[in-house]
Amino acid sequence: MARPDKAAAVAELADQFRSSNAAVLTEYRGLTVAQLKTLRRSLGEDAQYAVVKNTLTKIAANEAGINTLDDLFNGPTAVAFITGDPVVSAKGLRDFAKDNPNLVIKGGVLDGKALSADEIKKLADLESREVLLAKLAGAFKGKQSQAASLFQALPSKFVRTAEALRAKKAEQGGAE
């Protein structure tokens, strides 16, 4: 690869690191082209999976301010650049690696923080952002319903108590 081509490749990779909220490094040794195509589809629309040259990618990551990945650039390396929900792509990688042991998750970075392979697998065990937001909204809605019931119960209980007192006084007044 000519020097200007290398500089362009480094610039493009650095842009991908900057525009991604997560990147996962994998070793793909032994995977066929068809398997790589299946892997790319399993990552979702918001992820791009690229086979990369270690030296160029290491330089690009450092240019993008990510210097925690240096130890992971050995052997055949591919990077999943994730711009959307990292949980969805992490699930895709984990599930694909279960079915295809030739794919090895090396580690990655999420919002500038280095992640080990185990941390990426734990990330994959989380529910997606949308599901977590829906659960949170459901919890708030349930609490609001309980509060509304409580606020409705207080005045009606007060009215029933006042009515019982009035009836008791009327009964006591009529008995005398």
From Swiss-Prot:
Top-rank taxon, per record: Bacteria
Record-stated family: Belongs to the universal ribosomal protein uL10 family.
CDD domains reported in the protein's UniProt record: Ribosomal_L10
Functional summary from the UniProt entry: Forms part of the ribosomal stalk, playing a central role in the interaction of the ribosome with GTP-bound translation factors.
UniProt xrefs under Pfam families: Ribosomal_L10 (PF00466)
Provenance organism: Streptomyces avermitilis (strain ATCC 31267 / DSM 46492 / JCM 5070 / NBRC 14893 / NCIMB 12804 / NRRL 8165 / MA-4680)
Cellular component, GO annotation: large ribosomal subunit
InterPro entries, per database record: Ribosomal_uL10, Ribosomal_uL10-like_sf, Ribosomal_uL10_bac, Ribosomal_uL10_bac_type, Ribosomal_uL10_CS_bac
Alphabetical GO biological process terms: translation
Entry keyword rRNA-binding: yes
UniProt gene name: rplJ
Listed name of the protein: Large ribosomal subunit protein uL10
Family annotation (Gene3D superfamilies): 3.30.70.1730, 6.10.250.290
GO molecular function: large ribosomal subunit rRNA binding; structural constituent of ribosome
Keywords: Ribonucleoprotein, Ribosomal protein, RNA-binding, rRNA-binding
Subunit structure, as described in the record: Part of the ribosomal stalk of the 50S ribosomal subunit. The N-terminus interacts with L11 and the large rRNA to form the base of the stalk. The C-terminus forms an elongated spine to which L12 dimers bind in a sequential fashion forming a multimeric L10(L12)X complex.
